[in-house]
Swiss-Prot record:
Organism: Haloarcula marismortui (strain ATCC 43049 / DSM 3752 / JCM 8966 / VKM B-1809)
Name assigned to this protein: DNA mismatch repair protein MutS 2
Entry superkingdom: Archaea
Family: Belongs to the DNA mismatch repair MutS family.
Source organism phylogeny: Archaea, Methanobacteriati, Methanobacteriota, Stenosarchaea group, Halobacteria
Physiological role: This protein is involved in the repair of mismatches in DNA. It is possible that it carries out the mismatch recognition step. This protein has a weak ATPase activity.
Binding of ATP, residues: G659, P660, N661, M662, S663, G664, K665, S666
């Protein structure tokens, strides 16, 4: 996108010769050089020169030419009445749009009409309902840097404002992934990877340093929200909020605002309205909520589908959304993106949901009443900015009228949250009564053309209307009286906006025209006249109409201002109605889809018959599965103490999950995460029973693709995500790993997978689900005291593989990769050749991985591994054991040489075969202090030396 969108260079050269109107346009383009200026000329918004070419191309409208004393130049115009759709197109193309309106009445100005930029439309500062396109929040973010990053977010359309500070670039990305801002401004001190932090869809602008200056930021925060030192924690947050407010003022055209380049912007008028409704700032600490980083938000498909195929494009928020109003939809999204860590708050939500679930009649009545609630947050935003029309006020009054009924349905509530809502729902009776007394029930869209104020509200307005009406009645009677007086039966009395009232006589009757008729207009077949009496009545009507319209508009504005004074109360009411709507929605989902009330605060994840909330809606027969992780004592290494816990006492907290593709591994792992997330958001969960811990974070390493633009391969992306998990996961985290180690050699992949498994088990102790096709890894799980093997069962019918989607103990006996290839439509010749190669691999060491793998013993480390039951001399078996690896008959090779070396760790036999230097290096490694990456590098070095 060009840095400036103003007129081309020739206009600068001809600046002194420009017409007054084009000089005005050029000056606005220069002042708002970061935006595309749409310049009102009558009923159109025009763009000229280079900007006209862009507008015509993007909006698919005709490019014309304008000619004046300076020559010809391109021009493109869009009708004001349909401007929103064209503005949306320009926004989608990545442009900001500066709206320059006529701020004078052309009929009252002899020279050029004055114009001013009344608002700047950007992706993150939309307030127009037509452009917002839905109930979801539309945030603009501001970021500053220092010892910590300061982050502020604002939805101008609703007034929602948040602020926080974090310590790293990745933490900034995590917080932004929660809110998904459409636009961001950054201070001059911010140096981050834009795509990685903000994402490619976010419009990012480097804003002027003065806007982020500490003193100015403190003044702005204080002006809107109160003393910043009481609201925010540190200068970074204050600077971020100050810069964000400065940008909001700039886009609203506020007097004294500062543009991106630091230059003051001081238009003559402020039609976009004030930001006085911004009166509540929420400062939050990310550590108070379950942390969902950008990877988890994407892979769990909380708010956006990764693929447009399947599942009816449903996300989690779509699936559990039974909210009745826009307020509830936004609040639901907020609760899901910030699951709670406080058990009392979680239980309070569950208690309210339980009471509503038990009472379907109340739930249905509340839902019906909430469906009558308009979007109060956006309504009061428009009211406060002076952009609301009479219909907006009636919508607000209609919402207030249902609040008493909502309160009545909560009068007998026992649940704490419901009782609190009953006590605090404010019906704003005086505000509703004032609106209903002043505004007609079905007012026109425009507030300047009359018909807005009720009769009886204002005596002077009633008098003017009476004068206007009596004058029109006199005119209505004039036609009959003049026909009688003149004897002209075809005589008509009419009105045009240009010539006013007239008496029309056809040419055939001109001889009968009285002397007091004065000619007003000549037509082809008739003449139009007026009389002194008609002119007098017309002037009287026009004076009354004009005075009534002016008075009516003044009265409307006064009512609107009174409502704006109650903005804080309206916003508080909106928040409470939104919370109630979400609780009712949770209860409705629980009742319709058989969700259970979870118990939170347990020592482990214990789910009976759990289901994936999204997938179960799209499949006729979803197979539920149990999950049991870490509900017993933990290994000594998890809490740093040695309390005498033995391997026999440990309930596994790490599960290695095997099974063919399409068997359900990924769905199952995501299902566990979504159940935990829903529970901590306050919802019931899709299961028969659920005892859950309070998770501090959910990590996902599920699927990846190349980042070609960033120069990162799939494997590099996977390792980067893995490093984040190993560095940040705690014993209270849930880790989902799917196929770690792809994109490199089998030996490297197995080595990494094993090292990661051991580190998560020995050092982190996080609740972990590790899906893999590396069946050698099942031997590692069998040897770890806090780990277990689980697999998805398959069966055969008439030689075909059937996926049962049932989770069972032990590892899978085979991968069924060839069968899956056949089901996918791979040519028969390739499938048959694959079967031949696989058969060879099962009978000889050909370097092709077999489908059944040899159990390899691993000597346990004291206090963390099981021992005797995984001895390498165990009885030969051909099927999976309860927790052991699937084993093949003695002597049957099942994996390539490198993979066997990685997993052959049993005692002196292997060590005797190692070169002495390798053995010495191996003995010198301090495994207890090595990081996972250091361990992987050391292992790779040893492999190179052995080879």
């Amino acid at each position: 996108m060009d840095a400036a969108l103003g007129p081309p260079e020739q206009m600068a050269e001809l600046e002194e010769d420009l017409t007054p109107m084009m000089a005005q346009y050029y000056e606005l383009c220069r002042q708002y050089d970061d935006a595309l200026v749409l310049f009102q000329v009558g009923d159109f918004y025009e763009a000229f020169c280079a900007a006209a070419k862009r507008v015509a191309r993007l909006c698919e409208i005709t490019l014309t030419q304008r000619e004046d004393s300076t020559g010809e130049y391109p021009m493109a115009g869009i009708p004001i009445d349909n401007a929103e759709s064209y503005v949306e197109t320009l926004l989608d193309a990545g442009y900001r749009v500066a709206i320059a309106d006529q701020v004078e009445d052309p009929d009252e100005v002899s020279g050029v009409v004055e114009r001013a930029v009344t608002r700047i439309v950007t992706p993150g500062t939309l307030t127009e309902s037509e452009l917002l396109g839905g109930a979801d929040n539309n945030y603009v973010a501001a970021l500053t840097a220092g010892e910590r990053y300061g982050l502020a977010l604002l939805d101008i359309s609703t007034g929602d404002c948040y602020a926080t500070s974090v310590g790293s670039e990745s933490a900034v990305a995590d917080e932004l992934s929660r809110f998904g801002p459409a636009e961001a401004i950054v201070g001059p001190d911010v140096d981050v990877d834009r795509d990685a932090v903000f994402g490619p869809a976010c419009l990012v602008t480097r804003y002027d340093a003065d806007a982020f200056a500490q003193d100015r930021a403190e003044d702005r925060v204080g002006q809107y929200f109160g003393p910043p030192e009481r609201l925010l924690a540190g200068g970074a947050e204050i600077r971020a909020c100050g810069g964000l407010l400065a940008y909001a003022e700039y886009t609203r055209g506020s007097s004294g605002a500062v543009g991106p380049d630091g230059e003051p912007v001081d238009p003559d008028v402020d039609p976009a309205g004030t930001l006085d409704y911004l009166n509540h700032l929420t400062r939050y600490d990310p550590r108070e909520y379950m942390l969902l980083d950008a990877v988890a938000v994407e892979s769990l498909e909380l708010f956006k589908r990764r693929s447009v195929r399947g599942h009816e494009n449903r996300t989690l928020v779509d699936t559990v959304d039974e909210t009745a109003c826009a307020l509830g939809r936004r609040k639901l999204t907020d609760w899901l993106r910030r699951p709670l860590l406080d058990a009392d708050r979680i239980e309070a939500r569950h208690g309210a949901v339980a009471e509503l679930q038990r009472d379907p009649a109340t739930r249905e009545e509340l839902s019906a009443l909430l469906a009558e609630v308009y979007d109060l947050e956006r309504l009061i935003s428009r009211v406060s900015r002076g952009r609301a029309n009479a219909r907006d006020l009636r919508s607000l009054a209609a919402t207030l009228s249902v609040v008493p009924d909502i309160r009545d349905h909560l009068a007998d509530a026992d649940a704490r949250l419901l009782a609190d809502l009953h006590a605090t729902l404010d019906p704003l009776a005086e505000t509703r009564e004032e609106i209903e007394a002043a505004i007609r029930p079905d007012p026109p869209q425009q507030v300047t053309e009359g018909g807005v104020i009720r009769e009886g509200y204002d005596e002077e307005l009633d008098r003017l209307r009476s004068t206007e009406q009596s004058g029109k009645e006199w005119i209505d009677e004039l036609e009959a009286s003049e026909r009688e007086r003149t004897g002209i039966d075809s005589l008509k009395v009419g009105h045009t906006s240009v010539h006013g009232y007239y008496i029309e006589v056809t040419n055939a009757n001109l001889d009968a025209v009285p002397e007091d008729y004065q000619r007003r207009q000549t037509l082809k077949n008739s003449e139009r006249y007026y009389t002194p009496a008609l002119k007098e009545r017309e002037d009287e009507i026009l004076r009354a109409e004009s005075a009534a319209d002016d008075l009516e508009y003044d009265l409307f504005c006064a009512v609107r201002d009174e409502v704006a004074d109650e903005a804080e109360r309206v916003q508080a009411l909106a928040d409470r109605l939104a919370r109630l709507d979400v609780l009712v929605s949770f209860a409705e989902v629980a009742a319709q889809y058989d969700y259970c009330r979870p118990t939170v605060g347990s020592d482990g994840i214990d789910v009976t018959a759990g289901r994936h909330p999204v997938v179960e809606r799209t499949e006729d027969a979803f197979i539920p599965n149990d999950t049991h992780l870490g509900s017993g004592p933990v290994p000594a290494s998890r809490d740093g103490s040695d309390d005498g816990v033995t391997a026999d006492d440990i309930q596994p907290f790490l599960a290695v999950v095997t099974g063919p593709n399409m068997s359900g591994k990924s769905t199952y792992m995501r299902q566990v995460a979504l159940i935990c997330l829903l529970a901590q958001s306050g919802s019931f969960v899709p299961a028969k029973a659920a005892d859950l811990p309070i998770l501090d974070r959910v990590f996902t390493r599920v699927g990846a693709s190349d980042d070609i633009a960033g120069g990162r391969s799939t494997f590099m992306i996977e390792m980067t995500e893995l490093a984040t998990i190993l560095d940040a996961a705690t014993e209270n985290s849930l880790v989902l790993l799917d196929e770690v180690g792809r994109g490199t050699s089998t030996a490297d992949g197995l080595a990494i997978a094993r090292a990661v498994t051991e580190y998560l088990h020995d050092e982190v102790g996080a609740y972990t689900l590790f899906a893999t096709h590396h069946h050698d890894l099942t031997a590692v799980a069998a040897a770890l005291s806090g780990a277990t093997n689980r697999h998805f069962e398959t069966s055969r019918e008439d030689g075909d593989v059937r996926f049962d989607h049932e989770l069972a103990p032990g590892p899978a006996a085979a991968s069924y990769g060839v069968e899956v290839a056949s089901m996918a439509g791979v040519p028969d010749s390739v499938v048959e050749r694959s079967r031949d190669l696989l058969a060879d691999a099962e009978t000889a060491d050909t370097g092709v991985e077999a489908t059944r793998e040899t159990e390899v013993a691993s000597e346990p480390r004291p206090g963390t591994r099981a021992d005797s039951e995984t001895d390498s001399t165990a009885t030969e078996t051909t099927g999976p054991t309860e927790n052991g690896a699937a084993s093949a008959p003695a002597g049957e090779a099942t994996s390539d040489d490198h993979a066997q070396e990685v997993f052959q760790t049993n005692g002196a036999a292997a060590e005797d075969e190692l070169p002495e230097s390798v053995a010495q290096q191996l003995a010198s490694l301090d495994v207890a202090t090595m990081t996972p990456i250091e361990a992987m590098n050391a292992l790779a070095d040893l492999q190179d030396r052995i080879e």
